[in-house]
Amino acid sequence: MTGLLQKDFYNLRTAIKNLLLILVIFIAYLIFRKHEFILPLVPVLLSSSLLTTVINLDRHSKWNMLMITAPLQKSELVKEKYVLLMLLNVSGVLIGTIVSIPFIISGTMKLVSFIDMTVLGWSVALLQGTIFLTYTYLFDKNLLEKLEIMMLVSYVISFAIIISVYYLVPDIFGTKNHSLIITHIVIWAIILLTYFIFWKISVNKNMKSEQM
């Protein structure tokens, strides 16, 4: 799996440079507009979009066909993509944290706001990536021809689910004075569990297809 991760990060080197440039421009704009509280959200949200680049590169390089002759199982490739998603998300969180530290120290950004936006962004990115990988490895392979559309749809679904759950929390607990941080941490924990469940399902499905 280490070799597969190295391959993907090597293939992503140009895309990562371009993404970092976009981030710098985006961050500069947010600072100029005095919207520093959004800084933790942006890097982690963009991190999952790199999955499209990776899978596109695999498809165009005929990597899936090369795997037939390589000493690798398809299930290993699937497992590696889920690990890659988590690594990309963690990298996005770290970048958001590094960028936010000066504003937290100066008092421009509240620590509570930083934690809240970080957890919210990670929840959306992780759910989006999980939905995207589930589409890719569990359903019609013709969907691989529409990766960009799948990526956009998975973002929309992620935001719709998380925002809906957030607004349902006051009704469920009978209060409108619930904690945003606690709400987002609970949502993140549920999404993390969903991520591992679909990881297992995707790997098992591909293991069964290899045995047939």
Located regions from the model:
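Alpha-helix N-cap/helix-start motif at helix boundaries, enriched for small hydrophobics
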Residues: E76-V78
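Short helix-to-coil transition segments within interhelical loops
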Residues: I68-K74
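Hydrophobic alpha-helical transmembrane segments of membrane proteins
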Residues: M1-K62, E80-M212
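Short extracytoplasmic
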Residues: W63-M67
